[in-house]
Amino acid sequence: MIQKNWEELIKPNKLEINPGHDAQRFATVVAEPLERGFGLTLGNALRRVLMSSLQGAAVTAVQIDGVLHEFSSIAGVREDVTDIILNIKQLALRLHAEGPKRMSLSKKGPGVVTAGDITAGADIEVLNPDLVLCTLDEGAEIRMEFTVALGKGYVASDRNRPEDAPIGLMPVDSLYSPVKRVSYKVENTREGQVLDYDKLTLQIETNGAITPDDAVAYAARILQDQLQTFVNFEEPEQKHVEESRPELEFNAALLKKVDELELSVRSANCLKNDNIVYIGDLIQKTESEMLRTPNFGRKSLNEIKEVLAQMGLHLGMEVPNWPPENIEELAKRYEDQY
């Protein structure tokens, strides 16, 4: 007999996302409670996936006018080509289309050449325009072309060299991961009378191409997909007994859970942390009440209003006798109506 104890293990009922001074790049994610030992298990797994497996964009090769190889120097340019390439590796990019794509740069001295001088086109965003690439003396000029592609993890320069590479094309080591740093710690936390559950705290820094909370969500999805391979049994289907359904006093759509809506990770987590489970809970909230929710901003509010409008609903509605005492049972009975 299969021991289905996974149904009995405690799952986190609290997920906090605390943005840093730059919410696009820094955040602390706290999940609790977890079974004893699961903080270390999940923290280590999430950290490894965050650092190695998320997709990002990076420069794969560069061409500089008048330069044949990376051990050259350029007249009037203070940095040698090796240093310029090291700076190019630090470019933070967001690619909005399938690669590879091209960027270019052309500038005359004197002055500092930064990432903001790059002409990237509509498909590429340069996220750190203040990054210094090189310095030009009076009368000096530099022209460069970059190849940008999507990938994951680290790819050495020799793997970025195409077979038909023209003379002067210099492949670059590519670090695709949009996540720069991840650390985690595990502490004890209390749930009811039990004092030794785990509390997992993740500190995440990205390059701005992805928010830390989205990065965690994608990493968790990767783990979920990989672990599904090891589930080698089928769970028996529960037999549903047809019963007469009582007539509802409200729209059956209110029984739908908010985590089934197509919301962003940030919006979904804000609702979860505010104990908003069903759409019926959500629509009774006013806009001002929602905006007082921690980490919930105008962008999330507009997103939720748009989703509700598609269902013919809006915030600030009144639902008499909500929630019904048998809400979970009703939600199962009427799930074919929403």
From Swiss-Prot:
UniProt keyword terms in alphabetical order: DNA-directed RNA polymerase, Nucleotidyltransferase, Transcription, Transferase
Keyword Transcription: yes
The protein's Enzyme Commission number: 2.7.7.6
Group of enzyme by EC: transferase
Quaternary organization: Homodimer. The RNAP catalytic core consists of 2 alpha, 1 beta, 1 beta' and 1 omega subunit. When a sigma factor is associated with the core the holoenzyme is formed, which can initiate transcription.
Record remark on domains: The N-terminal domain is essential for RNAP assembly and basal transcription, whereas the C-terminal domain is involved in interaction with transcriptional regulators and with upstream promoter elements.
Role, per record: DNA-dependent RNA polymerase catalyzes the transcription of DNA into RNA using the four ribonucleoside triphosphates as substrates.
Record's protein name: DNA-directed RNA polymerase subunit alpha
Organism: Parvibaculum lavamentivorans (strain DS-1 / DSM 13023 / NCIMB 13966)
Gene: rpoA
